């Protein structure tokens, strides 16, 4: 559903941003 999609997208976003900040 929408909530599940938003949740997975949020987790991906956090991992993506975290990877950039850790470089």
UniProtKB/Swiss-Prot annotation:
GO terms for biological process: defense response. The keyword Secreted applies. Expressed by the skin glands. GO terms for cellular component: extracellular region. It comes from the Eukaryota. It is found in: Secreted. Keywords: Amphibian defense peptide, Antimicrobial, Secreted. Antimicrobial peptide. Belongs to the gastrin/cholecystokinin family. Magainin subfamily. This is Magainin-R2.
